[in-house]
Structures are given as structure tokens and as C-alpha cells.
Amino acid sequence: MAVDYSKAVKCALFCQEVYRNFSTVVFDGLVETPVLISEDSTDTQCAILPENSGITIVFRGSDSSFDWQTNFEFKQERAEFEQQIIQQQIVAQQEQVYPYQQKSSSGALMHRGFVNAYFSIRDQIHEYVSNHEIASVTTTGHSLGGALATLCAVDIQYNFHNKVSIEAYTFGAPKVGNDGFRESFNRRVPNSYRFVYGMDIVAELPRWWQGYRHVDAELRIGSRFSLNFLSARFKDHAIDKYIHLLKTMVG
């Protein structure tokens, strides 16, 4: 599998930039004006970045009010992270749905919370792709944004495969669906690159015993060993960690 690490760095930087004040975010190196999409009811945001004959759709990650640079050595801060980010946004909910129809024979099931968030901005994404002459779409996101980028990739392929090619670059993304979804995604989006840094805890969620499976292709970067095991699992989720190491890999 040939991986474009330069593009991975570019996508990771976009993921970092989209965490800034969303209404005024400026993406470095972008010539054309980005299209910003935001839905307050689900606190879901993405930016469509046009470049040449393609677009990159960058999904904003988990709770923007949370400081990813927090020193997780402190138990109270670690507990706050777990409550706000994991319990409320990532741990599997009881109900799951398939995105294209209520009852499907495919067996593909997906996390309801992720689907609801994506569907709240899906129409605007579809409208843009439908109304513009584009040849390729890249979806990207960090953390929760990675889950939404995964959903968007398979959705765009399903609905616009005759118009565009699709790639996905995600960083520290949680699992999105079950085996049925995994098989469908891998078949539809073969150019998918799921980066996991070190001991990133979010990439392990939701748990396998809840029926969730990761999509391909996993790309492990960074060390999976630390003397401070618990702290490292949270620190390794920061997008800055991904960017720093990917830059060293590009040289």
C-alpha cells in the first residue's frame, strides 16, 4: 500500500486548523475560499476546501471547548476528559442505524450518535458535490472528526461514485460500525488511511465486545510503550503528536 505521507501531513494540519474559531478559521496555503458548514443543533462542523479539480472535506473533532493540551498527569483533568469526550461522544449508544435506509439486509450498523451528527450537515455536503465540477474528494478528521470523515467517505462513494474518486485520511478516529459496515466501507473506499499514534485511547473505542470494528487501513505511528501508561493513552490522542511525527517521516 503506497501512502502519501505529504498529503497526510497536509490533512493533519487542516484538522488542527479547524479546531480554531470556526467562523473565522483561515487555512494556511489555501488559495480558494473555503466553504464552512455548521449545525448548532448537533454541534457539528466541517470545512470544504477546494483545490484544483478536487476538494478536501475537513470535519471538526471532539468538543471544541476542551483543551487538548491539558496536562493529563492530573487525575481530575483526566477524569474530565473521560467524562466529556469518551462517555458523551464516543462510547456506543444502545441504538444503531444504517445510514441509507431504516431496515437494511446488508447487516451494516453504525453508531447512532455519529450518524446523527453527520446527517445534520449531509445535505449541504451533497449539494456542494452535486453543483460543482470536481474529480476527487478527500475526507479527513481527527477524533470525532475522523468518525465523521469515515461516514462521509462511504456516503460520497455510494452516491457519487460515477462522478468523483474518494480518499480518506483520519487521525485518532474511533470505531464507527460493525463488521457489516467495515466490509462495506473497505470495499467501497480502498484508499483509506487510518492513522493511530502510539497508545491513543480514542482509537480503541467503542470496544470490540460492543460489536464495533475498525475500517482499514490502520497505520500505526509512534511508540506503543510508555512508563506512564495511563497518561500516555490520553496524551497520544493530541493532533499535535500526529503532526510532529508525520512531518519527521516526510523529512
What are the language-model segments listed below?
Residues 1-140, 144-251:
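Non-catalytic, mobile gating and regulatory segments of ester bond hydrolases
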